[in-house]
Amino acid sequence: MREIVHIQAGQCGNQIGSKFWEVISDEHGIDPLGQYHGDSDLQLERINVYYNEVQKKRYVPRAILVDLEPGTMDSVRAGAFGQLFRPDNYVFGQSGAGNNWAKGHYTEGAELVDSVLDVIRKEAEACDCLQGFQFTHSLGGGTGSGMGTLLISKIREEYPDRIMTTFSVVPSPKVSDTVVEPYNATLSVHQLVENTDETFCIDNEALYDICFRTLKLTTPTYGDLNHLVSATMSGVTTCLRFPGQLNADLRKLAVNMVPFPRLHFFMPGFAPLTSRSNQQYRAVTVAELTQQLFDAKNMMAACDPRHGRYLTAAAIFRGRMSMKDVDEQMLNIQNKNSAYFVDWIPNNVKTAVCDIPPRDLKMAATFIGNSTAIQELFKRVSEQFTAMFRRKAFLHWYTGEGMDEMEFTEAESNMNDLVSEYQQYQDASADDELNETIEQAETE
């Protein structure tokens, strides 16, 4: 079976990671102690993708929980599903990274990294045929960003041919925890560009907007935000966990979604968006789902797809529905919005359908877009980075851990290159190549 090893690092990573396990355990009929109480064989058919079976019918998540301080781990362990995880797979330090990327990447994190790799190795060796790794973390803090990217590069060294997927929470100006977020995020993106195959950019600002505007929650908590993230993660991984009419695994997803290796930052979306309380009352049609999916308000990254063009996109529908309906609606939306899809990748929207809907919904859909508009997000972080870096503000926290200013300069220019690459493909059209060929022919 194609197994996935899940790693969650830092406070944010552990919070969204734990929520993800709650959601999928529920979908697979697994209680907080790992016992199966489901009602359908489909729940167990591909359970090994995410769980190890220990004794008869007891399932343990193939998850590794990492942090540089014990606090978050303690609350996970005390939470509803705390007894589900394997006790040896909690790996934590005592010192904390203090929201400092350098501590996570070079000093504190580097000391803990070998014990984490031992656990990862152990999980990977127990796999029948390891498909890849999925990582949940934030880019704004110290552990998830600094130590997270360190782990990713180490795993990359050891398993170069396995897919590396990350769910990365990008800092946003409206929802800020620390003033040095732009530094941490830029240094992280510098790593992610080189070392991951697919990165789902989740943005707190977008999540807040969804809670506020669409779900009409007046004071959204992190719990509400994490609820949205887990719905999306559950949707993205549906195809891996359940049999369906059109299936995807991490590698197929990467092949369809990534036209150029550096441009693998996706914006996820989810439909129908309903708040936790009034989920059960809404009937949805395939047409409505498709409409909602491509709506800018539904994107989990705070950038507007109408400001760019889609290089590629994928939609994953869940529930009992006719494939014909789905195909018609997807074609329809592409024809209506053809200006927003690049014309030099024909058929750049892929669809998958899985028969099993999420709890309390008859139908749902998840959207993954590789849009050039994601550059807005990088631009935003980059501007904040430059503003501080010009004055060398807060740099001593990083140089004190042995970092060099050069590294900041490199990270900054790598981020700017990424933005220009997106811009270049946004402006490119199929006719350009044609015109160039004609011009060359004329000059010759």
Swiss-Prot record:
- Cross-referenced PANTHER family: TUBULIN
The name under which this protein is listed is: Tubulin beta chain
Q: Which organism is it from?
A: Onchocerca gibsoni
Q: Where does GTP bind?
A: 11, 69, 138, 142-144, 204, 226
GO terms for MF = GTP binding; GTPase activity; metal ion binding; structural constituent of cytoskeleton
Please state which protein family the record places this protein in: Belongs to the tubulin family.
Listed under subunit, the entry gives: Dimer of alpha and beta chains. A typical microtubule is a hollow water-filled tube with an outer diameter of 25 nm and an inner diameter of 15 nM. Alpha-beta heterodimers associate head-to-tail to form protofilaments running lengthwise along the microtubule wall with the beta-tubulin subunit facing the microtubule plus end conferring a structural polarity. Microtubules usually have 13 protofilaments but different protofilament numbers can be found in some organisms and specialized cells.
InterPro entries (UniProt xref): Beta-tubulin_BS, Beta_tubulin, Tub_FtsZ_C, Tubulin, Tubulin/FtsZ-like_C, Tubulin/FtsZ_2-layer-sand-dom, Tubulin/FtsZ_GTPase_sf, Tubulin_C
> Which positions form S-S bridges?
none
- Chief localisation class: cytoplasm
Pfam families documented for this protein: Tubulin, Tubulin_C
Report the function annotation for this chain: Tubulin is the major constituent of microtubules, a cylinder consisting of laterally associated linear protofilaments composed of alpha- and beta-tubulin heterodimers. Microtubules grow by the addition of GTP-tubulin dimers to the microtubule end, where a stabilizing cap forms. Below the cap, tubulin dimers are in GDP-bound state, owing to GTPase activity of alpha-tubulin.
Per the UniProt entry, what is one GO biological process?
microtubule-based process
Keyword Metal-binding on entry: yes
State the compartments where it is located.
Cytoplasm, Cytoskeleton
* One CC-aspect GO term: cytoplasm
Q: Which gene carries the instructions for this protein?
A: TBB
Q: Where does Mg(2+) bind?
A: 69
Gene3D superfamilies per record: Helix hairpin bin (1.10.287.600), Tubulin/FtsZ, C-terminal domain (3.30.1330.20), Tubulin/FtsZ, GTPase domain (3.40.50.1440)
Its keywords, alphabetically, are: Cytoplasm, Cytoskeleton, GTP-binding, Magnesium, Metal-binding, Microtubule, Nucleotide-binding
Cofactor annotation: Mg(2+)
